[in-house]
Amino acid sequence: MDVNPTLLFLKVPAQNAISTTFPYTGDPPYSHGTGTGYTMDTVNRTHQYSERGRWTTNTETGAPQLNPIDGPLPEDNEPSGYAQTDCVLEAMAFLEESHPGIFETSCLETMEVVQQTRVDKLTQGRQTYDWTLNRNQPAATALANTIEVFRSNGLTANESGRLIDFLKDVMESMNKEEMEITTHFQRKRRVRDNMTKKMVTQRTIGKRKQRLNKRSYLIRALTLNTMTKDAERGKLKRRAIATPGMQIRGFVYFVETLARSICEKLEQSGLPVGGNEKKAKLANVVRKMMTNSQDTEISFTITGDNTKWNENQNPRMFLAMITYITRNQPEWFRNVLSIAPIMFSNKMARLGKGYMFESKSMKIRTQIPAEMLASIDLKYFNDSTRKKIEKIRPLLIDGTASLSPGMMMGMFNMLSTVLGVSILNLGQKRHTKTTYWWDGLQSSDDFALIVNAPNHEGIQAGVNRFYRTCKLLGINMSKKKSYINRTGTFEFTSFFYRYGFVANFSMELPSFGVSGINESADMSIGVTVIKNNMINNDLGPATAQMALQLFIKDYRYTYRCHRGDTQIQTRRSFEIKKLWEQTHSKAGLLVSDGGPNLYNIRNLHIPEVCLKWELMDEDYQGRLCNPLNPFVNHKDIESVNNAVIMPAHGPAKNMEYDAVATTHSWIPKRNRSILNTSQRGILEDEQMYQKCCNLFEKFFPSSSYRRPVGISSMVEAMVSRARIDARIDFESGRIKKEEFTEIMKICSTIEELRRQK
């Protein structure tokens, strides 16, 4: 039957239909090829916004640097990065005055974190620029390589396992005259394959020592590698994002810890909270403005958009902020926190892979690496690329571009939020000393501004003053993209507010469907997503029931597990029909074994195995959940697993789902082809790390331990823990004397081996 789509909306208030206009169904666009062009765009734009600043040369690396701070006051409307130090410091002072003790308290909290954080904090995170190999690696591998190189160069403070000591090594390394590193290279040779008698290319991995002088090492330590941001919806053009190396990461982490601590105490900050908590926080600010705008005042809200937030921020400004925030703190703490902004003021952007050329007539392709862009003849490039390269050439050193102004995407989200909130804080009547006043919300580069005044002229004056104040702090509110409404209707971080937040359900659309982990996890995640959306996103019962039916259908097609009594023929139907016929209680079969679906919107919280357990034949139960069955996954299955859910917007969310270990919880094996590449050593390293970490977790189940503070290695911590546990178990009679003696003997042997090593 044909449904007239307008009928769907007859009962729906217009603002609730906002979701239907979002570009969130279907696959998001991905980037292909090189990100070099996007990176050059970023570098060139950033310099253009600060072009009237002062040029200097870095004495260590020889890199030309542009400093726009305290530069000429900006022209109206043009985005610019000329932040004025005294204005930023004054905004900080007023922020502190409105929140007495906020900086002091946050510093104390951060100091505690700094002293307790272990170096393994840096293994979190995805791709990281590995300066030893000059390319991206998984974070854990990049950290291991860095520590290995440090050790072979006589830097061993990091062996304490504390992050702060690793950072001491980083500081030391920058003073060394040279650093020796091990690099990998590939040898290719043509050999005849014994089986097929064809010629094949064999790759072998060689390692060689390489010495980096101080200048080359500094350039690498200050390098941010760049990639193209994938899966951005609603944009025509791609853009570049940066991934910093291990030298920078630790320092950034501490700065962000301090800024996060401050943001938690600011009612206008949309970070670090999320979800319903964030909505509640924001609703409070709106409520305050609406209740305070008495009958004599009118209230308007700007849904704000800033032009090129990152490219106009400046690390030197962040340094000024940190210097102010930590002004009464111990010297060592101030030094640790000021290093990140100093490194960012001297950062280099790696231009990525370079360009690929192909000649149609000669059928050959050749790669022009970024290192060659400084010297290659420009006649091979089209006009726009030629302009980019000409512009960037004065900034190039060894395939990286000097990029002093600007902050690449996502590096100092918390600290830049503090800067934004400090302007919102200036809107109180006692600061504006006029009839208008403002407040608002800030989350990284996104903001909403609420202005109250007796009349429209006052509103206009307030907005103008806000706009100009922003300019003085290097923030450029876009007049084209921001829009103003009566307070009560606005959008902030993709939350739509209309006398309360409306659910923007389309944002969640990408997370519906079959995840593709395995039959067990997929069923569990699928129903959990539906359940969560009923709780958080206004997914009504009828729609949820429909979503569930669609999900089951999708699931059956994905895993070819149509019901045993269906006519649909697939590769699995023969086995499934056989099982169906043999089974006495057919309702007990899992959907993935051709059983019926027993889910409805009332029982989504129950794992399928539990839901059907009482209905199952006994021998089916035995096969399904028997730990001796080789197909039941033997990895310790936590009762709760985490799935990473990608909403259409914002960061990936961690979602918990219940996991029951059955024959369906298999884990696919790694692709073989990786084992023949240079990545193989890395894989082995990763597995070794994994094993060590798993072992450590066994000794210290997360419920029972506070991280070992103080200086002990993982092995020492585990041995001492084993001894304590053994003694307790022996004294309470849980283990026999022989077992106790054996454990003690093993512990002593381990310590002995460590001493000999």
UniProtKB/Swiss-Prot annotation:
Belongs to the influenza viruses polymerase PB1 family. RNA-dependent RNA polymerase which is responsible for replication and transcription of virus RNA segments. The transcription of viral mRNAs occurs by a unique mechanism called cap-snatching. 5' methylated caps of cellular mRNAs are cleaved after 10-13 nucleotides by PA. In turn, these short capped RNAs are used as primers by PB1 for transcription of viral mRNAs. During virus replication, PB1 initiates RNA synthesis and copy vRNA into complementary RNA (cRNA) which in turn serves as a template for the production of more vRNAs. Residues 53-82 are annotated as: Disordered. Influenza RNA polymerase is composed of three subunits: PB1, PB2 and PA. Interacts (via N-terminus) with PA (via C-terminus). Interacts (via C-terminus) with PB2 (via N-terminus); this interaction is essential for transcription initiation. Interacts (via C-terminus) with human PKP2 (via N-terminus); the interaction competitively inhibits the interaction between the RNA polymerase subunits PB1 and PB2. A motif (Nuclear localization signal) lies at residues 187-195, 203-216. GO terms for cellular component: host cell cytoplasm; host cell nucleus. It comes from Influenza A virus (strain A/Wilson-Smith/1933 H1N1). This is RNA-directed RNA polymerase catalytic subunit. PROSITE patterns: RDRP_SSRNA_NEG_SEG. Phosphorylated by host PRKCA. Residues 286-483 form the RdRp catalytic domain.
